[in-house]
UniProtKB/Swiss-Prot annotation:
It comes from the Eukaryota. One of its GO terms (cellular component) is mitochondrial small ribosomal subunit. It comes from Danio rerio (Zebrafish). PANTHER family: MITOCHONDRIAL 28S RIBOSOMAL PROTEIN S28, SMALL RIBOSOMAL SUBUNIT PROTEIN MS35. This is Small ribosomal subunit protein mS35. Residues 50-73 are annotated as: Disordered. InterPro entries: Ribosomal_mS35_mit, Ribosomal_mS35_mt.
Length: 330
């Protein structure tokens, strides 16, 4: 009975203590809010930073910039160590008074320090003569000696008549690709090809404007393919096709007469037969090959061929006149 009477009293006492604790917590929280509202924001931030950093929060003194590298470079230094590979222009590493840009107020162009014009353009500071020599020395163990028989350009052209030309470009734009880099030009001396008279004339006819008569050179330019190697293969293919097609003889080609020829040929022509008959009647009995080997006959042959192929000009007529006088001993 006593226990049942004391239980309500204990519960009411517990409620009173809880209320007192909650009121004291609210009072302390309100005091913190009032103090923080009174202090300025900068003071609170400074106090927080000082508490977080402590000794480490102190700023270190700024380092002074040293002298540029160009002032410490030796005269006989290894330049390949300064610019070992391709790189942009570095004013602190190039000991040259380089200037570039538009001069302001009729002055001199801007100096190299802070000059964007020098940084934008490509340079060849990594390809000095000393660097190229070092590269050549490093590649020597992997190369063979130049053939001793090819000691002149004439011999090189004789043994290697085909010349292939292409171009490489250095660009400072957004793309490294240049459409002209894929173009391949193949040149070959027409006389160096193994052709007879029929094949030689037919190849000239098939090549059309690709053949230059003054230099006797056949030029094939290919730019249809997107890659240089493809254009090279296509140029070699065209040369092979021209060579083999020139050797083919069609049925209609056998019906060509002397009047259908592209050029005048003195061999077996009426002019040759007439001059041989005239010389035989004047000088007596002589062999045909002996008469053809004489220099006077050769000069007459050249003058007639020149006049037939290039027209009857004053120079050609005078040359023909002198050849006839020498031939007939007039």
């Amino acid at each position: 009975m006593a226990a049942s009477v004391s239980h309500p009293a204990l519960s009411s006492f517990h409620k009173i203590s809880c209320n007192i604790t909650g009121i004291s917590g609210l009072i302390s929280f309100s005091r913190r809010i009032s103090v923080s509202s009174v202090l300025p924001t900068s003071a609170v931030a400074a106090k927080r930073d000082a508490a977080g950093k402590g000794v480490r929060g102190q700023m270190k003194p700024r380092r002074q910039a040293g002298e540029p590298r160009t002032e410490r470079m030796a005269v006989d230094q290894d330049w390949t160590a300064v610019y070992p590979t391709a790189a942009s222009f570095k004013p602190s590493a190039v000991p040259l008074p380089v200037r570039m840009g538009y001069p302001v107020n009729r002055g001199v162009p801007p100096a190299k320090h802070g000059n964007l014009e020098l940084i934008k353009i490509p340079n060849f500071l990594h390809l000095t003569p000393a660097t190229i020599k070092k590269h050549c020395e490093a590649l020597k163990p992997f190369l063979t000696e130049w053939p001793s028989a090819l000691d002149s350009d004439e011999k090189c052209t004789e043994h290697f008549p085909i010349q292939v030309q292409s171009k490489d470009f250095v660009s400072s734009g957004l793309s490294l690709r240049n459409p002209d880099a894929r173009i391949v030009t193949l040149k070959v001396k027409h006389s160096s090809l193994n052709l007879d008279d029929h094949a030689r004339k037919k190849m000239i006819k098939l090549a059309e404007k690709r053949y230059c008569k003054e230099t006797d050179t056949l030029t094939i330019t290919t730019d249809s393919c997107p890659l240089r190697q493809q254009n090279y293969d296509y140029a070699m293919y065209l040369l092979t096709v021209l060579y083999h097609e020139s050797w083919k003889s069609e049925a209609w080609e056998q019906e060509k007469t002397r009047a259908d020829m592209e050029e005048y040929e003195w061999q077996d022509s009426p002019s040759q037969r007439n001059i041989l008959e005239t010389l035989k009647s004047i000088r007596g009995t002589e062999e045909t090959h002996e008469l053809l080997d004489q220099p006077e006959v050769g000069e007459y042959r050249n003058s007639v061929t020149q006049m037939k192929n290039h027209g009857e000009t004053e120079e050609n007529l005078l040359r023909y006149k002198e050849a006839v006088k020498k031939l007939l001993q007039l």
